[in-house]
Amino acid sequence: DNSKKIVSNFNDDRIKYFYSDTKLSLYDARNKAINETSGELIAFLDVDDWWDKNYIFSRASLFNDDDKDFFYCNRFTFYEKNKKLKIFRKLDLPNGKIYNYLAKDYFISISGLIIKKKIFDQVGMFNKDFNIIGDFDLVMRMAKTFNGHAINEPLLFYRDHKNNFSKKNLGMFFNEFDKWFNNQVKLGNN
């Protein structure tokens, strides 16, 4: 993709671009990138998604609030096939400890999430054993202990297309989720 070229256009020392000479799994790459960061906040943007121009600024006043540990927003789903946008959630998103909400109806997209870096010290990094549900696993671990803050406005554009990795690998998704769920039962987290 054109990530390196796009990032170089910003001419801002705070924005860093990392390239690996070896192919890494998604979650191994994310863990390595997190370890290279020097800031206090971590945000993700998958290659086929994009943010509204106000994505970061809309929550900047909240970043220093000690009662808020991670921030997430609503999203639009952009359907590549027919070029239509649809708002993901029409109901207000919950704040605070949101584990029980997520256990019933998971609604967080990794590209719509900003995390205080110190959280990784307590919940750990992405689980490299997963190829699809690593985002879900991390968010569920965070949501048990830390306070989330929702922005109901859709500031993320999630692209839905025929080449979505999770769509093309549904069997892998279900196997990973089954493994995750069985582990939760063993740990008594059901």
Give, region by region, the residue ranges found by the protein language model.
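Acidic donor-binding segment of Leloir-type glycosyltransferases
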Residues: 1-19
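Acidic donor-diphosphate engagement hotspot in glycosyltransferases and nucleotidyltransferases
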Residues: 3, 30, 51-56, 81-82, ...
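Glycine-rich, basic loop-to-helix element that forms the pyrophosphate-binding segment
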Residues: 20-37
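Conserved nucleotide-sugar donor-binding catalytic segment
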Residues: 35, 73, 92-180
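The conserved acidic donor/metal-binding loop of glycosyltransferases
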Residues: 46-50
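Conserved donor NDP-sugar-binding/catalytic core segment of glycosyltransferases
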Residues: 54-86
